[in-house]
């Protein structure tokens, strides 16, 4: 099902609105990107009929881990916590469980602490805020199992939109850690990636930041 990018972006930015006040964009981006990742992975695995396999297998393992270890690590587990006390603590445990089973996610997905009272408030304030935040990611336009953004890469579009907005709101130059998709596409074409026939050729971006230029290079190859 096609979804308008304006709808997608509006819901993503609404999730940011829920966190304003307790922290600035350089901090709440970690919360939003974590939720976006969890929602995307959950939806995609559901769509493939492999919901019980929601995990990226640790490269150190040469066989599937115990199936029991795969459970309790999805966005649906966040949904089950809505309206409950200590929801932040529960969300942190779910994320920690996923990070423990996937060493590549250590220090990436678990840097945002959903039980931080200084940033999210305490007691009912935190519970209500996180419940509302989860509800936003349940909106139809954020259903990544079925939606396509006008034929484009929907998760890439969502990520680039957020990075652009975070860069602008934090007062930093957009080019400091984010290269607009339009610029990345032009650069990928200028260096002639599409005409390269050497399978061993590589692209180096020593200041890759969020990696948008490298992604566009792959698209052009």
Feature roles, as predicted:
Residues 198-207:
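Conserved class I S-adenosyl-L-methionine
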Residues 210-221:
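Conserved SAM-binding loop of SAM-dependent methyltransferases across substrates and taxa
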């Amino acid at each position: 099902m096609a979804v308008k990018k304006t709808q997608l972006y509006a819901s993503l930015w609404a999730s940011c609105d829920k966190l304003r006040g307790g922290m600035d964009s350089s901090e709440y981006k970690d919360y939003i990107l974590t939720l976006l990742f969890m929602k995307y992975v959950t939806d995609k695995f559901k769509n493939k009929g492999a919901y019980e396999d929601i995990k990226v297998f640790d490269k150190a393992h040469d066989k599937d881990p115990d199936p029991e270890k795969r459970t309790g690590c999805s966005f649906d587990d966040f949904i089950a916590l809505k309206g409950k006390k200590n929801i932040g603590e529960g969300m942190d445990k779910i994320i920690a469980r996923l990070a423990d089973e996937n060493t590549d996610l250590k220090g990436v997905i678990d840097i945002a602490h959903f039980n931080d009272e200084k940033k999210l408030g305490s007691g009912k304030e935190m519970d209500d805020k996180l419940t509302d935040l989860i509800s936003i990611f349940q909106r139809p336009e954020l259903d990544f199992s079925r939606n396509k953004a006008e034929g484009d890469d929907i998760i890439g579009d969502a990520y680039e939109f957020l990075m652009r907005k975070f860069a602008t709101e934090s007062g930093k130059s957009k080019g400091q850690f984010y290269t607009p998709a339009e610029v990345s596409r032009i650069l990928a074409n200028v260096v002639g990636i599409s005409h390269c026939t050497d399978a061993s050729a590589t692209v180096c971006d020593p200041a890759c930041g969020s990696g948008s230029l490298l992604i566009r290079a792959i698209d052009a190859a």
